A protein has these predicted regions:
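RNA pseudouridine synthases
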Residues: 1-272, 276
C-alpha cells in the first residue's frame, strides 16, 4: 500500500504579492486561520518555499512557490483506529460525507474510547494509506441517522463550519412526532439552555442560547406526523427540545417525550439527503 502525502495547499507568488510576509499570504490568499498556521508551522514540512522550510516572517519573491501542509494525522492525540462499518457516500481530498447509522456515537468519550465513528474513520484512513485527520463538521445525536460531513484537515473544518449557518450549508431532517403540529408549517424560535443539575438534558430557557428551527408537516397518520425540519442554529438536542416545547415530542424520545420500546427503540430522527 502506498501512503498518501498529507494534504497541501500551494501558491505561486505573483509580482503584486512579492515582498509580503508569508503569514500575510497564508491568511489572505489561502484563507488559513491563525490557529491552523500556528499548528503547522512547527512541522518539518509545514511551510515550504520552493521546497525549503521557511518561517512565516519570510518575504518571498515573484515566481516562488509557497506550499503549506494542512493535514496533521499525528496530531490526533489518543484516537484509537478501530475497524467498524462505514457508509461513505462522497469523498475527496478535503472531506468525507457518511451515512451515519443510529446507535453510533461520533466522538470518543467516557465508556466509548474505541467504538465511535471517529475511531472507524481513523481505521479506514490507516488501512487505505490516507494521511488525513478526523474532524466532524456538525453534530448528530447517538440515536440520529443520516448524513454527516467530516473534514480531513483543520482548514477544511474551519471553512465548512463557517458555512454551517449560511444558505450554502442546509441541514434538513425528517422526524416522526407525537400528535399533529398546528399550524402545519412554522418556525420555533426559542432559546435553549441546560437543565440545572443534568449533564445531558436541555430545555427552553429565556437565558439560553438563541435557537431557531423551521418545520413542515409532510404526512400524518395514527395520531403522528412525519415532519421536515431545518436548523437555522445548531444547539445540542435542538430539534428534540423544540418539538417537545410545542407539545409534539419525537416518537420514541426517552428524554423529552415517552419511551415506547414496543414501538421503536430509538428517537425517530434522520438527516435528509436532499433539500426541498
Amino acid at each position: 500500500m502506498v501512503q498518501q502525502s498529507p494534504r497541501r495547499l500551494e501558491l505561486t507568488v505573483t509580482a503584486d504579492q512579492a515582498g509580503e510576509k508569508i503569514d500575510t499570504l497564508l491568511r489572505r490568499e489561502l484563507r488559513l486561520s491563525g490557529t491552523v498556521i500556528r499548528r503547522v508551522k512547527w512541522l518539518d514540512d509545514g511551510i515550504l518555499l520552493d521546497g525549503m522550510r521557511v518561517t512565516t516572517a519570510c518575504r518571498p519573491a515573484a515566481g516562488q512557490v509557497l506550499s503549506v501542509r494542512v493535514a496533521d494525522p499525528d496530531g490526533q492525540g489518543d484516537m484509537v483506529p478501530t475497524p467498524g462499518p462505514l457508509d461513505i457516500v462522497y469523498e475527496d481530498g478535503d472531506l468525507l460525507v457518511l451515512n451515519k447509522a443510529p446507535g453510533v456515537l461520533i466522538h470518543p468519550g467516557p465508556g466509548h474510547y474505541s467504538d465511535t465513528l471517529c475511531n472507524y474513520i481513523a481505521w479506514y484512513y490507516k488501512k487505505a494509506g490516507i494521511a488525513a485527520d478526523v474532524h466532524p463538521v456538525q453534530r448528530l445525536d447517538k440515536g440520529t441517522s443520516g448524513l454527516l460531513v467530516v473534514a480531513k484537515h483543520p482548514h477544511a473544518q474551519e471553512q465548512l463550519k463557517g458555512q454551517l449557518h449560511t444558505p450554502a450549508f442546509r441541514r434538513i431532517y425528517l422526524a416522526v412526532c407525537e400528535g399533529i403540529p398546528r399550524p402545519p408549517e412554522g418556525c420555533i424560535d426559542a432559546p435553549i439552555g441546560r437543565v440545572p443539575g443534568s449533564l445531558m438534558a436541555r430545555q427552553v430557557d429565556p437565558a439560553g442560547q438563541p435557537a431557531s428551527t423551521r418545520y413542515r408537516v409532510l404526512r400524518t397518520g395514527q395520531g403522528r406526523a412525519l415532519v421536515e425540519l431545518e436548523l437555522d442554529t445548531g444547539r445540542t438536542h435542538q430539534i428534540r427540545v423544540h418539538m417537545a416545547h410545542i407539545g409534539h415530542p419525537l416518537t420514541g424520545d426517552f428524554l423529552y417525550g415517552t419511551e415506547d420500546h414496543s414501538l421503536i427503540s430509538r428517537c425517530l430522527l434522520y438527516t435528509s439527503p436532499s433539500p426541498r
